[in-house]
Amino acid sequence: MIKQKFSFAVVVTVLLLGLTSCDDEFTPNAEWREIPSVFCLLDQDDDTTYVRLQRCYLGDGNLYSYGSVADSLYYPAGEVEVLIRVWRNASDMSVSGATPIYVLNFTREMRDKVEGSFASGPQPVYCHRNMPGELDSAYTYELLVRRVSDGSTMASATTRLLGDPDNTYGWLKSPSPLSGGGVVTFNMLSGSCQIKWRPIDRGRLYQPRIRFYYRYRFLPDSLRYADIPCDAVKQTSTQILELTTAVIKEHYLNEIRKKLESDTNHKKFVDTVSVIMDVADENLNAYISSVTAMDGQDYQSYNNIVGGVGLFAARRAHLMERVRSDKGDQPNGMHSLLENLNVGFQQNDL
């Protein structure tokens, strides 16, 4: 396995909500060719699936002219349709006269991104409200962008969902999930804590994080948290039965300090944390790898859209298990470590 530091949650945000625009009209003088730019991530735990669809142009004209024109970025309402056909087997798609199990239809909606990178006003996004059973890891999903006027396919791609955790054992092995009744706690007594988990089908890149909980001393019902990222892990073989990473004490405490140092409230210790796991499939892993290489001169952006550019991939972003956190009173126990951060924890209130 290969470890790297990367949070693909950021990439996902850019994929779905990423571009700004202006109001000029598109009148390039050079020859050009229009192609769709399509981004979609499937997660069976999402209540809504989004497709980001834009137009991009290939040609020899001025890049600033091509890239800065609002009217050139989006297809007008009613010009294209977006749908996902669901097949029991990938081979069925090439069988003459075969029909999918069902079809997921998308509606065009205007959405705002009001803060952060690429903040902008209303932009069109294609949405489908997921119904129970529609997203099944056993099926193959075929994304289609079609021109309404003649029904022709402009862009297409296929993917499968990531697998589900084992029904009996789950995905997290250590520390012990509270739901499983195990005895291995999340602790820093040895200077680090090992996180161990079972791979899921078609998972290739795993990004764990620790959700550190705390309460305000005078608001005991105010459960709050700070997310602490861990090293990402790549799965390099389907034969691997266990993946692992380590949460280093110095990194963990430093991240807590940075996230809480501006909060002057008196805080209380909570004796549990959550282990959260974000997972990417091979397509998303390849795309992330190409994005991280963009700071060099020679790179090739990953693309799996037939007839266009972009990405159709699968992820898991909702895997979370609560575990017991050690609160030992010894000098290297969490009581003393938190108090020494000087961010509002006190030994007699922990």
Q: Residue locations for each model-derived region?
A:
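A sequence/structural signal for flexible, mid-protein segments enriched
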Residues: 23-350
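Hydrophobic helical h-region of N-terminal Sec-dependent signal peptides
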Residues: 10-16
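C-terminal motif of bacterial Sec signal peptides marking the signal peptidase cleavage site
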Residues: 18-21
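Bacterial N-terminal signal peptides that target proteins for export
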Residues: 1-9
